Amino acid sequence: MTPHPTRAPQATPAQILRDYWIKDHAALRLLVPNFYKVDADLYRANHPGHRRLRIARDRGIRSVLSLRGDEPTAPTLVEKRACAALGLELRFVRLWTTRLVEGEVLLELLDQLRTMPKPMLVHCKSGADRTGLAVTLYLHVLKGVPLVQARRALHWQYAHLPWSRAGIVHRMLDAYAEAHETTGIGFEDWVRTAYDPVTLTEGAP
């Protein structure tokens, strides 16, 4: 007889909290929240806990965009519960720290940044790389800030280290900057017609 497949046991509330505070480094994020106001509509941070989400709501923030994806992990489960309890709208886009995403994901990111209730908070795990890219695109594409200025959102001040593997995002931004300077093409049109994450990743460390 073929044995029935066994289901992985669901994590207990205690296990979820342990994974959240220890494995996901939530305890460290309490000390270094990496929380900044970008403009009247957007704030950035590392992965927020219930207390910081409550503070954000009390400041008028209405929605939260997680760049970690909607996965059944401890930090996502904790965040879902907190946002539901606080009345914050929570949405997800999955970006990666050390590799470039497909163009459809970048367009989805911009769509969420456009349509989510404002003011909004955007975050990843550390608030450095994925969040820095999201803020860069928000400022350049949605607010018309020149790219060279918008890229300041990717800075060591926010714990972004461009010489690390996370610096691969600059290959994409450099390629777009060259095309934009030459032809005047906008970022979204460039993503639809010319962006190739595979080619841009070749030779990356």
Residue ranges and their predicted role:
Residues C124:
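Short cysteine clusters
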Residues G127:
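Substrate/cofactor-recognition hotspot
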